[in-house]
From Swiss-Prot:
Residues 29-81 are cytoplasmic. This is Protein Vpu. Phosphorylated by host CK2. This phosphorylation is necessary for interaction with human BTRC and degradation of CD4. Residues 1-7 are extracellular. InterPro entries: Vpu, Vpu_cyt_dom_sf. Enhances virion budding by targeting host CD4 and Tetherin/BST2 to proteasome degradation. Degradation of CD4 prevents any unwanted premature interactions between viral Env and its host receptor CD4 in the endoplasmic reticulum. Degradation of antiretroviral protein Tetherin/BST2 is important for virion budding, as BST2 tethers new viral particles to the host cell membrane. Mechanistically, Vpu bridges either CD4 or BST2 to BTRC, a substrate recognition subunit of the Skp1/Cullin/F-box protein E3 ubiquitin ligase, induces their ubiquitination and subsequent proteasomal degradation. GO terms for cellular component: host cell membrane; membrane. Keywords: AIDS, Apoptosis, Host membrane, Host-virus interaction, Inhibition of host innate immune response by virus, Inhibition of host tetherin by virus, Ion channel, Ion transport, Membrane, Phosphoprotein, Transmembrane, Transmembrane helix, Transport, Viral immunoevasion. GO terms for molecular function: CD4 receptor binding; monoatomic cation channel activity.
Length: 81
């Protein structure tokens, strides 16, 4: 009987050690995944900012073109409204 009890306790200890190792590996992989998500988010943000900064000049050009369609600006002519 004590022989079976010793085997049972040893099996529980081995199972506990295996569970600790498995959950440690899962935790390490989870931290890697979270870190990669943060990197991807920063990369996406930087890429969007780069696209935005390139498009600002195009937006300004469109605004200037829209203002240019109003007619010529004559500083001395007050009734140009």
């Amino acid at each position: 009987m004590s022989y079976l009890l010793a085997i049972g306790i040893a099996a529980l200890i081995v199972a506990l050690i295996i569970a600790i190792v498995v959950w440690t590996i899962v935790y390490i992989e989870y931290k890697k995944l979270v870190r990669q998500r943060k990197i991807n988010k920063l990369y996406k943000r930087i890429r969007e900012r780069a696209e935005d900064s390139g498009n600002e000049s195009e937006g300004d050009a469109e605004e200037l073109a829209a203002l240019g369609e109003m007619g010529p600006f004559i500083p001395g002519d007050i009734n140009n409204l």
